[in-house]
Amino acid sequence: MSEHHSKRALSLDDLVNHDENDKSKLQKLADNESSVRSDDNRPGAIENIVNGNNSNSDLNSNGVIEEDTDTDDDVGGEFTFDNGITFDYDKQDRFSPEKKRIQARKKDTSKTTPSISNESPSNSKESSVPVDPLSSNISATDRKDSSEEKPDLTGPELVKEPDTNEYKRPSIQSITNAEDTTYNDHKAAGMEKTSNKHSLPNILSDSIDETVTEEHKPKTETEQTITEYQQENKQKDNVNESNSEETHDIKNDNMNQVEKIFQEKTSTLSKKNSVKKDLELLNEISASSKPNKYKNTPIWAQKWKPTVKALQNIDTNDFKIDNSILDIIPDDDLTKSVQDWVYATLYSIDPDLRPFIELEMKFGVLLESKSPDRVNPPVSSQAVYTDMDAHLTPNVDETVFKELSKYIQSLSEITENAGKFNVIEAQTKDAVYRVGTSTQRPRFLRMSSDVKTGRIGAFIEKRHISQLLIYSPKDSYDVKLSINLELPVPENDPPEKYQHQTPVSERTKERVSYIHNDSCTRFDITKVQNHNKGIKSNDVEITHEIELEINTPALIKAFDNIMTDSKEYATLIRTFLNNGTIVRRKLSSLSYEIFEGQKKIQ
């Protein structure tokens, strides 16, 4: 090694700074070389290189530690200085084929390989330096043929001149000044780093800077070893990086496959349930999004709710309802009117004559006084007709008469009513005589005799007291209530006295009477033949009369006890009117059925 250094030519720095002391310059170069050798021989540095610490990012763009070459042989051992103090290295290998291949490789690698930038030590593990094909090629050629001469690649980066379109190196002075600045910066940075992990970049950067300044200095064995380690580590890093990326991709694929395996496959039912949940959520949102005026119904639009539920304490299993809060049934207005009318009429009669009164109800059509038409007052329910000019002729339709007779007969023959009805049939002839003088009120005497035997059954004076007309717009027939007095004729005025006189009217009656003792009512169904003796002819008119007569002794008793117990009187009159209502409605229903039947027959 000493022989090699003794034969060494002067460096470019010596050539440029030739005015300095030659001895001091040589001493400085010797010190630098010794420091590089001592650092290379340390095991720590080699260890860092083997471990793949890629912190040597301060190398040149080609990633190759260039060798120093002698220029004495090329120029005949003499140095020529031009005015620009430049040294043209291109003249040595301008026409060399190896130079062209190297330049072509530089262009390819500059396109495909990103430039190496100085990174902090903390990021040195993550970053990887790409392998330079130029450096690997040069190292391979060195191993194949060590005796072959190599072109000078230690020069600085080529610069293209615009005039000649030729690549030339910059001046020696600019190169040396830039290299000295880089050397000092790297050395200062290396002094600040104390970690053993980052010691290799400092050592390498210092050694590289020294080799750059000593362009003509030949490579030592240690430097060649470092270069080989660097190239191997770069290749390993690239392989490891590609392997790690492949491994990471494989792991990601496996994770995706596992996630896909465990993904729940939604069924049709689950989809429907999710749709229902979404709809419920939308409904809740829409309901909650309504303004307050739509949430709370105003008072005027709310339905009425009773505060107390009706009949809430009634036991339906043992249901028993009272007639009213007073446990009585108040009479309707019509019944009350009849009760008052009867009471007033009876009160007006002499108490000695009250036992001879007769309260009867007859059915017929209420006619106007001046026309044969039925009255038509503006009412829709049963009412008392107060027009005294109207009159009612007791008469019903023959067919209805017969049907009603059958109906009442059937009622009397029902087993449940056995003993409640007394039936009396009679055929009598009534002759009415007018008795009195012109100065007295006329009297009408009625003589009743049996048609078959001719025996006189009764001889009475009949006085008309009062009547009440009741109009029933919903029924076929109206009602007339009348109170009469049937006074017996005194014994000094016997009936034989009037047998030779001409009666005012004669009537032959075929009567069937149904006496219902429980209701104190007598039902007289009578077919009447009226013998009208006129001047021109002797006509006979047949009518069908239905009469209801109240039990007079019961009525007088109830009337006398009205001051102590008014219920008996009110009940008696009400019962009598109820029996009349039943008959009236039955007559109306029979009339309707008969009328509809006649229409069908026609």
Swiss-Prot record:
It is an enzyme of class 3 (hydrolase). Residues 1-249 are annotated as: Disordered. Its main location: nucleus. It holds the Pfam family mRNA_triPase. Residues 65-76 have a biased composition (Acidic residues). Residues 15-42, 88-110, 141-169, 213-222, 231-249 have a biased composition (Basic and acidic residues). It is found in: Nucleus. SUPFAM superfamilies: CYTH-like phosphatases. Its EC number is 3.6.1.74. GO terms for cellular component: mRNA capping enzyme complex. Its cofactor is Mg(2+). Residues 171-181 have a biased composition (Polar residues). First step of mRNA capping. Converts the 5'-triphosphate end of a nascent mRNA chain into a diphosphate end. This is mRNA-capping enzyme subunit beta. The gene is CET1.
